[in-house]
Amino acid sequence: MLCREPRLYSCQRLKEAAKRQGHEMDILDPNRCLLKLSQNPPHFQIFYQENSGSKPYLLPDYDAVLPRFGTTSTQMGCSVLQHFEGKGTFCLNSSQAFLNARDKWKSLQLLLKTGVPVPNSFLSGGEVQAQATIPHISSPTILKMLNGSQGIGVILAEKPQSAVSIMEAFKQTNISMLQQDFIEEAGNADIRCFVIGDQVVATMQRIGQDGEFRANCHRGGKTEKIILSDDEKQIAIRATKAIGLDVAGVDLIRSKNGLLVLEVNASPGLEMIEKTSGVDIAAEIIDYIEINAFINLR
């Protein structure tokens, strides 16, 4: 497992599930990996340094790799994943799918291209004056940093001029922001689906604190059980496939025009959705790896 914080709930649950099913799992920090490319075989080698004073050693051949790195490690994490892919190792998820999911704008493009419904969204180039975007801004509107996570970098602007002021401020630090229609009828609630392969294995509704439009659990929101229709589940599965992921956390919102996909997460947390749904998602992931890594080895 590629993970920078092995003590996190999700990493511990996955390691425990693997052990219960008779597997050994190493947890590797992608930022401690050394990657080597060579014209002569073996073409792809990965070395690992346990700590700053130790000598890097050659990693063994693994049957499967499970990436669980955060947004700050996306570049190196995906480089390590690509190296494992070069070695022919089964990776859940692929490096390209990870990159697709971590780019908020690209993921929206991929979703809409494959017919998955998303909120009306807008992105302007760095040389476009923020004032010129006013005709395209809904009121109120949501502003999102392109690489934010856990609700960080998501801002509600009540009026178009407020949105312009916020964008101008962020532009000074070379941070681009996308705009999305605010789905007022959803209140401060959204839905998280956990998709593995062709199945939605768990769901939960997230509800933000009073006065907080973001429903993320990291922002103090609460969760409760929710049942989705088969059509709603299919939207979550289609969204996962559109990004190229095998395992994903898909965030949905119910609007007056139907269900919309807000985001597709490549490394979704397990804690709140396991505790809310009662589903052993960690075991489901290990089961999926067992089946697909075996096919990959044949």
From Swiss-Prot:
Signal peptide as annotated in the record: none
EC number of this enzyme: 6.3.2.-
Binding positions (Mn(2+) 2): E263, N265
Residues that, per the record, bind Mg(2+) 1: D251, E263
Cofactor: Mg(2+); Mn(2+)
Pfam families for the chain: RimK, Rimk_N
Cofactor remark from the record: Binds 2 magnesium or manganese ions per subunit.
GO-annotated molecular function: ATP binding; metal ion binding; ribosomal S6-glutamic acid ligase activity
A single GO cellular-component term on record: cytoplasm
GO biological process, one term: translation
Residues engaged in binding Mg(2+) 2: E263, N265
Alphabetized UniProt keyword annotations: ATP-binding, Ligase, Magnesium, Manganese, Metal-binding, Nucleotide-binding, Protein biosynthesis
Span of domain ATP-grasp: 108-290
Entry similarity comment: Belongs to the RimK family.
Xref: HAMAP family: RimK
Record's protein name: Probable alpha-L-glutamate ligase
Gene source species: Haemophilus influenzae (strain PittEE)
